[in-house]
Amino acid sequence: MSAKINAKKLEMFDLLKQFIDSKQNLFFLDYRGLNVAQLTELRNKIEGEHGSLKVVKNNIMKMVLKEKNINVVDSCLVGPTVVVTALEEANVIAKIFYDFVKSSTLKVKGGFVLGEFYDEAKVQAYSKLPTKKESISLFASVLKAPVSKLARTLKALADVKN
């Protein structure tokens, strides 16, 4: 029986290792109090933005992180834990689960963004940053404003001369 358990744990270890392989953005959430439907809804929203969500066993996750030389605060791996990974824009994924936090018992424990540990407060601040699309749009409007102002000024001068 012990060999069966160890084989199962080894399989879980390998699956978790593959799950976080080459992912630079990881978030740890406490899903205590969520029902299956809520967890499925959260998973679907996250996967819709190129992220992944996986319920993990804390001890096995600790071993995987240790093997990958990732130091995580112990409080991130206590109690029921889901790990969320982001393939692209991590702050979009963070916005999704923070929107979910407002209407459920979901709690953010912390995470890693580009290899740097973020506590709950930092993850929340990170979730409020503009997305890549929003940043590009803002930058374009900043570039456009002086040109528009110049055009209005030249038009006003032309109107005055006529």
Swiss-Prot record:
InterPro entries referenced in this protein's UniProt entry, alphabetically: Ribosomal_uL10, Ribosomal_uL10-like_sf, Ribosomal_uL10_bac, Ribosomal_uL10_bac_type, Ribosomal_uL10_CS_bac
Gene3D superfamilies, alphabetized: 3.30.70.1730, 6.10.250.2350
Q: Which Pfam families match?
A: Ribosomal_L10 (PF00466)
Keywords assigned: Ribonucleoprotein, Ribosomal protein, RNA-binding, rRNA-binding
Q: Name one GO biological process term.
A: translation
- Which GO molecular-function terms appear in the entry? large ribosomal subunit rRNA binding; structural constituent of ribosome
Q: Which GO terms describe its cellular component?
A: cytosol; large ribosomal subunit
Q: Which HAMAP family match?
A: Ribosomal_uL10
This protein's assembly is summarised as: Part of the ribosomal stalk of the 50S ribosomal subunit. The N-terminus interacts with L11 and the large rRNA to form the base of the stalk. The C-terminus forms an elongated spine to which L12 dimers bind in a sequential fashion forming a multimeric L10(L12)X complex.
Name the family the entry cites.
Belongs to the universal ribosomal protein uL10 family.
Q: What does this protein do?
A: Forms part of the ribosomal stalk, playing a central role in the interaction of the ribosome with GTP-bound translation factors.
Give the protein's recorded name: Large ribosomal subunit protein uL10
Source species, please?
Answer: Borreliella burgdorferi (strain ATCC 35210 / DSM 4680 / CIP 102532 / B31) (Borrelia burgdorferi)
Gene name in the database record: rplJ
